[in-house]
Amino acid sequence: MSDFKAILAKLADGKSLSRDEAVAAFDHLMSGEATPSQIGGALMAMRVRGETVDEITGAVSTMRAKMLRVTAPDDAVDVVGTGGDGSGSVNVSTCAAFIVAGAGVPVAKHGNRAMSSKSGAADVLASLGVNIELTPEQVGACIAKAGIGFMFAPAHHPAIRHVGPTRKELGTRTIFNLLGPLSNPAGVKRQMIGVFAKHWVEPVAQVLKNLGATAAWVVHGSDGLDEITLTGPTYVTELANGVTRSFTVTPEDGGLATVANADLRGGDATANAAALAAVLNGVKNDYRDVALLNAGAALVVAGKAHDLKEGVALGIKSLDSGAAADKLAQLVAVSRA
């Protein structure tokens, strides 16, 4: 791409790319034709200046154009965190996904192996017996039959492999940490996204609005968690009816208590899988409560609950009735069929 030098020169001068320039730039970066120097230079220039809403919107458009799609119902939701919050916590959004599915909302969960924690969504689900190496058609069948399916990011975003080695060598967060959660292969229009820093809450909601999302909550816990936290307030930007608004929520808004020193420490995939299964099977602890808060918000985004308190109440019903645990059993069975 001869124009790429012009794009790099623009980035080197500290200038921002337009949405169309970002589409073209990321098309080149993910084409297999970009050199490691070009990839590293572009990613670091954006990172140092701070990526803009237009750049992220353009990059996501390119990611979505190149991804292998999954068929899912129009009302499907995703509950996902960017990761990279450095907390090494249990898998909150993965647990919340089963609670949401148990409440009757189809879930198209997008995720990957661990980035900064010891165990990502893919690691935990594999440890629970879910077959994560599925074709897009098989994932679609999981969503249709079990009400929940897991899309393993590398299988649906093959173009990402071209930037993988450079990202690893850079060893720092780049725009790609934000692109994954925004590039759900099932094209869900309703999302609950946790981000690793407060300053990303509003811009990510704006990107979702630009790309035609119906409803979303983008959240960041005041303790640094890329989820709604149990330890204090959480910053939220909500997208509803084409309008974004920002506010904070506390556990009390969901009918739960703030726990100053919530024990959400995670271990390896086996330990985190056991902790997740325990919550689905009725154990009451901090992990259950934080999963309920996040599931409650996802149920608001799904249009199933009017507010966080009602969402949490529906989540409790999903757990206590055994419906959430049934969803895990069904996903294991269908994914291995």
From Swiss-Prot:
<dbReference type="InterPro" id="IPR036320">
    <property type="entry name" value="Glycosyl_Trfase_fam3_N_dom_sf"/>
</dbReference>
<feature type="binding site">
    <location>
        <position position="89"/>
    </location>
    <ligand>
        <name>5-phospho-alpha-D-ribose 1-diphosphate</name>
    </ligand>
</feature>
<feature type="binding site">
    <location>
        <position position="227"/>
    </location>
    <ligand>
        <name>Mg(2+) 2</name>
    </ligand>
</feature>
<comment type="function">
    <text>Catalyzes the transfer of the phosphoribosyl group of 5-phosphorylribose-1-pyrophosphate (PRPP) to anthranilate to yield N-(5'-phosphoribosyl)-anthranilate (PRA).</text>
</comment>
<dbReference type="GO" id="GO:0004048">
    <property type="term" value="F:anthranilate phosphoribosyltransferase activity"/>
</dbReference>
<dbReference type="GO" id="GO:0005829">
    <property type="term" value="C:cytosol"/>
</dbReference>
<comment type="similarity">
    <text>Belongs to the anthranilate phosphoribosyltransferase family.</text>
</comment>
<feature type="binding site">
    <location>
        <position position="167"/>
    </location>
    <ligand>
        <name>anthranilate 2</name>
    </ligand>
</feature>
<keyword id="KW-0057">Aromatic amino acid biosynthesis</keyword>
<feature type="binding site">
    <location>
        <position position="121"/>
    </location>
    <ligand>
        <name>5-phospho-alpha-D-ribose 1-diphosphate</name>
    </ligand>
</feature>
<dbReference type="Pfam" id="PF02885">
    <property type="entry name" value="Glycos_trans_3N"/>
</dbReference>
<keyword id="KW-0028">Amino-acid biosynthesis</keyword>
<feature type="binding site">
    <location>
        <begin position="91"/>
        <end position="94"/>
    </location>
    <ligand>
        <name>5-phospho-alpha-D-ribose 1-diphosphate</name>
    </ligand>
</feature>
<keyword id="KW-0808">Transferase</keyword>
<comment type="subunit">
    <text>Homodimer.</text>
</comment>
<dbReference type="GO" id="GO:0000287">
    <property type="term" value="F:magnesium ion binding"/>
</dbReference>
<keyword id="KW-0328">Glycosyltransferase</keyword>
<protein>
    <recommendedName>
        <fullName>Anthranilate phosphoribosyltransferase</fullName>
        <ecNumber>2.4.2.18</ecNumber>
    </recommendedName>
</protein>
<feature type="binding site">
    <location>
        <position position="112"/>
    </location>
    <ligand>
        <name>anthranilate 1</name>
    </ligand>
</feature>
<feature type="binding site">
    <location>
        <position position="81"/>
    </location>
    <ligand>
        <name>anthranilate 1</name>
    </ligand>
</feature>
<dbReference type="Pfam" id="PF00591">
    <property type="entry name" value="Glycos_transf_3"/>
</dbReference>
<comment type="pathway">
    <text>Amino-acid biosynthesis; L-tryptophan biosynthesis; L-tryptophan from chorismate: step 2/5.</text>
</comment>
<dbReference type="GO" id="GO:0000162">
    <property type="term" value="P:L-tryptophan biosynthetic process"/>
</dbReference>
<feature type="binding site">
    <location>
        <position position="226"/>
    </location>
    <ligand>
        <name>Mg(2+) 2</name>
    </ligand>
</feature>
<dbReference type="InterPro" id="IPR005940">
    <property type="entry name" value="Anthranilate_Pribosyl_Tfrase"/>
</dbReference>
<feature type="binding site">
    <location>
        <position position="227"/>
    </location>
    <ligand>
        <name>Mg(2+) 1</name>
    </ligand>
</feature>
<dbReference type="InterPro" id="IPR035902">
    <property type="entry name" value="Nuc_phospho_transferase"/>
</dbReference>
<feature type="binding site">
    <location>
        <position position="93"/>
    </location>
    <ligand>
        <name>Mg(2+) 1</name>
    </ligand>
</feature>
<keyword id="KW-0479">Metal-binding</keyword>
<dbReference type="InterPro" id="IPR000312">
    <property type="entry name" value="Glycosyl_Trfase_fam3"/>
</dbReference>
<feature type="binding site">
    <location>
        <position position="81"/>
    </location>
    <ligand>
        <name>5-phospho-alpha-D-ribose 1-diphosphate</name>
    </ligand>
</feature>
<feature type="binding site">
    <location>
        <begin position="84"/>
        <end position="85"/>
    </location>
    <ligand>
        <name>5-phospho-alpha-D-ribose 1-diphosphate</name>
    </ligand>
</feature>
<feature type="binding site">
    <location>
        <begin position="109"/>
        <end position="117"/>
    </location>
    <ligand>
        <name>5-phospho-alpha-D-ribose 1-diphosphate</name>
    </ligand>
</feature>
<keyword id="KW-0460">Magnesium</keyword>
<dbReference type="InterPro" id="IPR017459">
    <property type="entry name" value="Glycosyl_Trfase_fam3_N_dom"/>
</dbReference>
<keyword id="KW-0822">Tryptophan biosynthesis</keyword>
